[in-house]
Amino acid sequence: MIFAERALLPGGWAEQVRITVTGGHITEVSKAAAPQPGDTRVSALLPALSNLHSHAFQRAMAGMTEHRIAGRDSFWTWRDLMYRFLDRLTPAQMEAIAALVFMEMQEAGYAAVGEFHYVHHQPGGDAYADIAEL
């Protein structure tokens, strides 16, 4: 059970909220409740956030474009590097990168993600045999 001094519920902020969790699911929410022995106590409780715009593959580019040379680097040079990088990624590598990024988001408290990627074809431009590959 979780006891929150304040919790943001669908109807707005509530005080003294006790949440019952059974089998990993919220089964009861009680307002103006009293904490019970063994409750996890928090001062404020919010719903988990959603990341509405993720490019998980860019996590694997971290460090490749951290410094720019004045007058030589721009959004367009970054974009060219990104597409060259994508040309080398396999579906298995994309899956591993996304698994890491999604795990990091979950650990940070995100509950959902809207994922966008630029990989729709194999390196060289041919379509994947399995259209569900990417």
Could you say what each language-model-derived stretch is?
Residues 60-96, 123-127:
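Active-site gating loops and adjacent loop-to-helix segments of metal-dependent hydrolytic enzymes
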Residues 47-59:
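Histidine-centered catalytic micro-motifs
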Residues 5, 24, 53, 109, ...:
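Divalent metal-coordination and catalytic microenvironments
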